[in-house]
Amino acid sequence: MAVRLLFPTYVFHRNFLDPNLDESQGYDLEYAEMLVNEVDEMRKRDPMGRNVSNSTSPTENYQAGWQSNDGCESNAIFQKCMNRISRFFQDEVLPFHGIHDSSGMRMKAGNSWANINEKGSFNRPHTHNGCWYSGVLYLKADGDEGCFVATDTDQKVLSMFPHHQRVKGDMVFQPKTGDIHLFPSGLLHMVEPNYTDKSRYSISFNMDMESVINNQDGKGNFGQDFSDPNYDSEEFVFNLDERGNPIR
């Protein structure tokens, strides 16, 4: 007996503090602390920030955290960070989607903003319009300041069913310092309330891809068909053992 996965959602993960990454793929804790300090300075320069998905509990007298306006991608202190994000996308996401020769293609954060989630603050369910992939990078997080929750909006069952981890409507991530998640922009997601006395720092971003053809910026061949004639259509088919678990 076998099971086939239909229409999976692809979420890519890396931790930029991983010591196994080379210098062009990650960074050290000292740089992470530098980013946190810069976010604090950004807040001093713009204490109001903006309210988009960031919210506060209606039953508690808490602030809604703080979200900057766009612009991290043009901040000199964030350039190393932005380069690492682009490299991650080039290394992992593009090859997975069949783009093995990315020469002439330039990945960058089209817009990026900083977040400080304080006690009681959370982010309402939302998607990111106008891009292919979005992401979040955690600059300072211990894992207990509110989970990142992705929600499956594709109805798979319309009646009663046995509860099991394989039939669930959401996936929960407990972010730690250095974690980065890249996800399709249409993935519905939210951030649970922070019930600790700590503040979590992160930056969110929307990825933009451009082709550079004859030194002219444009979408170029990004819209072309990258289908692989040798693609294995059975890659998401798994045989099951006697307990119903996939054999990998």
Regions found by a protein language model. Give the residues of each.
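Non-heme Fe(II)/2-oxoglutarate
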Residues: 1-101, 122, 221-226, 230, ...
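Short aromatic/hydrophobic contact patches that present stacked aromatics
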Residues: 13, 136, 204
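Histidine-dependent nucleotide/RNA phosphoesterase domain, centered on the 2H-phosphoesterase fold
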Residues: 104-105
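Catalytic core of non-heme Fe(II) oxygenases with the double-stranded beta-helix
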Residues: 108-182, 192, 209-221
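Double-stranded beta-helix
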Residues: 149, 207-248
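Ligand-binding loop in jelly-roll beta-barrel domains
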Residues: 188-202
